[in-house]
Design a protein with these regions (language model features):
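Internal intein/HINT superfamily modules and their associated LAGLIDADG
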Residues: 1-152
């Protein structure tokens, strides 16, 4: 399968954000009102759907579009190939992941709900990580934040 939509910095950020909190139904996220609002604003900024197509269900914000869902799943599945280099797209994708499920505690940057592929992606970009269950710790967070800001 080939991604039909053009992968932009904004779309890469949205996919990274969506990936960490995705719903099983449609294209959406599960989270608090602030996270939902962020997701909705990014979807509208990327012009994926009109505001009337966005649904709010309990703690989820989502919309339905099978073609976009397949494209987003393709990007997530092939993230290690698509985001193999330090550039604007990769920085946006990783920033989306951090903004969605990241925190900063005791000098260590943490990203929740990660997979082994996520760890591989971050390590290939030159960051040292430590993973416990689904939580990925990134050592030297100053370098990580510098990478995100430099290419944003």
């Amino acid at each position: 399968m080939v991604v039909d939509m053009k992968l932009t910095k904004e779309l890469a950020y949205l996919i990274g954000f969506w990936k960490m909190r995705s719903t099983k139904d449609g294209i959406g996220i599960t989270g608090d009102a602030e996270q939902q609002q962020k997701f909705i604003s990014e979807v509208l900024k990327a012009k994926l759907v009109t505001p009337d197509r966005v649904l709010l269900k309990g703690d989820s914000a989502l919309f339905h579009h099978i073609k976009y869902r397949n494209d987003l799943l393709y990007v997530v599945k092939n993230q290690n190939d698509l985001f193999a280099r330090k550039n604007k797209l990769t920085a946006a994708y990783v920033k989306g992941m951090y903004d969605s499920a990241g925190s900063f505690e005791k000098g260590i940057l943490l990203i929740n709900n990660t997979t082994f592929q996520d760890q591989m992606l971050i390590e290939r970009l030159g960051f040292y990580t430590e993973r416990r269950k689904k939580v990925l710790g990134i050592k030297h967070p100053d370098k990580f934040f510098e990478f995100i800001e430099r290419y944003s």
